A protein has these predicted regions:
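Short glycine-/small-residue-rich Rossmann-like dinucleotide-binding loops
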Residues: 46
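SAM cofactor-binding core of SAM-dependent methyltransferases
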Residues: 1-28
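Class I S-adenosyl-L-methionine
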Residues: 30-38, 50-197
Length: 197
């Protein structure tokens, strides 16, 4: 188990809570092919650029743009695993999780374009040149899924932390991609509208 973090306080928290955690440093300086293989990559790019309370710089903003680094690492890790001779369900990481604010549903031009790009970039980990359409002129739904053949699924759901043991109302989008099957919507218990590519 490893983590990519550069802030001192979060590093100290993980050292206390997960003493065996390996800290690998700044995500922008990592090469996915050199990282120890894992089954899941979890990330939540800083939300200030996507938040309705922020400047709305979107994915092109310096902070929320770290999402692209997460996708790059997943691609590099999966490519390295394939070069080692792994195939199909054995290629790691099998799963990717992304968490962010509901403002991602409306960030970008046209409204919601940033969330469309998030979906498209994750789908492209599995299928390099696919286009994911937006819901325009309607807004993104709070839950949904994408299926690509029989060996890829992606699902998202907006959850409120108050129902998960946190003493505050704090809604977040959780997105899960399964690069080798159709379990993403089961993981999030999603009832949804879906798009089959």
């Amino acid at each position: 188990m490893w983590a990519s973090e550069i802030e001192a306080f979060p590093i100290e928290v993980t050292k206390q809570r997960f003493p065996s955690m390996i800290h690998v440093g700044d995500i922008t300086k990592l090469n996915g092919a050199e990282l120890p293989p894992v089954d899941i990559i979890c990330g939540g790019s800083p939300c200030q650029d996507l938040s309705v309370a922020g400047a709305r710089a979107g994915l092109s903003g310096a902070r929320s743009g770290l999402f692209m680094e997460q996708v790059r690492l997943v691609k590099e890790m999966r490519n390295a695993d394939e070069q080692r001779g792994r195939a199909g369900h054995a290629v790691r990481p099998r799963y990717m999780l992304w968490e962010n604010v509901p403002g991602a549903f409306s960030s970008g031009t046209p409204k919601g374009e940033d969330f469309r790009i998030v979906l498209e970039e994750i789908v492209r980990v599995k299928c390099g040149s696919v286009y994911v359409p937006g819901p325009y002129p309607w807004p993104w739904q709070s839950a949904g899924r994408i299926l690509l053949g029989t060996d890829f699924s992606l699902a998202w759901r907006c959850l409120d932390a108050q129902y998960w043991g946190v003493a505050q109302r704090r809604k977040r989008i959780f997105l899960v991609a399964d690069f080798a099957g159709r379990t993403a919507d089961k993981i999030l218990s999603v009832s949804y509208t879906h798009l089959t590519l």
